[in-house]
Amino acid sequence: MNPSRCRILAVGKVRRSWIQDGIELYRKRLPGLEIIEIRDSTPDKEADSIRASLRPNEHVIALMEEGDAVGSIPFARRLDQLGNQRLAFVIGGADGLTNELKGRAHWQLSLSPMTFPHELARLMLIEQLFRAQAILQGSPYHRA
């Protein structure tokens, strides 16, 4: 997994400082990872902004409650199988993603069957990206 080939497209701003601190901690550990903030709006306007931000060659991974729930090791393996593809992780707003965006995704992923604030989902995703990299590199960060 190459962080410089990954982008996170997330609706809304991170307002809680402790979440922002966590995101920055992992961003430093994942040089090249790009986070694009999409302005909060209606689901259709958010979808328009997300579509406009997606690149044609990106493998789209939509984060959604009803997506596939996988553990950290299978997540790392799946990212490894994607090789050098460019990845776009998409986190919707409070109302989630439109059906069109869900259908466009190459993979629908759930971080948990529980519901979390979207800014916390962003922190959880970036930590899992770092963990996936650590797993693939054999780092002691991940202790199963």
Swiss-Prot record:
GO terms for cellular component: cytoplasm. It catalyses: pseudouridine(1915) in 23S rRNA + S-adenosyl-L-methionine = N(3)-methylpseudouridine(1915) in 23S rRNA + S-adenosyl-L-homocysteine + H(+). Its EC number is 2.1.1.177. The keyword Cell wall biogenesis/degradation does not apply. S-adenosyl-L-methionine binds at residues 63, 92, 111-116. It is found in: Cytoplasm. Keywords: Cytoplasm, Methyltransferase, rRNA processing, S-adenosyl-L-methionine, Transferase. InterPro entries: Alpha/beta_knot_MTases (IPR029028), RlmH-like (IPR003742), tRNA_m1G_MTases_N (IPR029026). The keyword Transmembrane does not apply. One of its GO terms (molecular function) is rRNA (pseudouridine-N3-)-methyltransferase activity. CDD domains: RlmH-like. Pfam families: SPOUT_MTase (PF02590). Specifically methylates the pseudouridine at position 1915 (m3Psi1915) in 23S rRNA. Belongs to the RNA methyltransferase RlmH family. Homodimer. This is Ribosomal RNA large subunit methyltransferase H.
